[in-house]
Amino acid sequence: MKPLIVLNLKTYLEGTGEGAVRIARACKEVGEASGIEIAIAPQFCDIYRVASQVDVPVYSQHLDGVGAGSFTGHAFAKCIKDAGAVGTLINHSECRLKLADIEASVTAAKGEGLRTIICTNNIATTAAAAALGPDYVAVEPPELIGSGIPVSKADPEVVTGSVAAVERIDPAVKVLCGAGISKGEDLKAAIELGSVGVLLASGIVKAKDPKAALEDLVSLI
């Protein structure tokens, strides 16, 4: 099974507007050359821009568990899907939700056929998230996000423990590894610890050459 790489553009200027399109093209080119699925999660306003210009899997950075109607300021599943997204992040550490809201978001996303990635911060929350039946959980200790120190080195037990916990609860759910991921050795270590891929951001988005950074990321797989 080839790993999954999900690149979160957050609200970085480098990944905004046409910058999002340029990085998406790099994801497509490196993904095709390596045979590895590389998805991208742009800002809401760039989902359609990216999806309509680049043939690459696009994820939303967030999704609210509401439908059409009187929900000013919310992002609902059908709108996100119609914009061109194939999946969504839920409960990123920079956009945290209560458990009931996470469940509502997962249900709404599944209703539109969107893939779901619930972000978690430790083994206990990973286990709780797995019980909601997402496609993936992405375990990311917040203190390591953007640090350049990969979780696979700083806290490998949180990855192996999360993999074991998810396997007990729902073997259909897969585990991604996040926080501090930026190099080929980080992805290789994440896979060796039992995850099926990585969720990452600044190590690629803010690199001088995002395509070269992506090529390094997949170089050991």
Swiss-Prot record:
It is found in: Cytoplasm. One of its GO terms (cellular component) is cytoplasm. One of its GO terms (molecular function) is triose-phosphate isomerase activity. Its EC number is 5.3.1.1. It comes from the Archaea. Disulfide bonds: none annotated. Its main location: cytoplasm. The active site is at 92 (electrophile), 140 (proton acceptor). Pfam families: TIM. Gene3D superfamilies: Aldolase class I. Pathway: Carbohydrate biosynthesis; gluconeogenesis; Carbohydrate degradation; glycolysis; D-glyceraldehyde 3-phosphate from glycerone phosphate: step 1/1. GO terms for biological process: gluconeogenesis; glycolytic process. It catalyses: D-glyceraldehyde 3-phosphate = dihydroxyacetone phosphate. The keyword Isomerase applies. InterPro entries: Aldolase_TIM, TIM_sf, Triosephosphate_isomerase, Triosephosphate_isomerase_arc, Triosephosphate_isomerase_AS. Substrate binds at residues 8-10, 145, 180, 201-202. Keywords: Cytoplasm, Gluconeogenesis, Glycolysis, Isomerase. Involved in the gluconeogenesis. Catalyzes stereospecifically the conversion of dihydroxyacetone phosphate (DHAP) to D-glyceraldehyde-3-phosphate (G3P). Belongs to the triosephosphate isomerase family. Homotetramer; dimer of dimers. This is Triosephosphate isomerase. It comes from Methanococcoides burtonii (strain DSM 6242 / NBRC 107633 / OCM 468 / ACE-M).
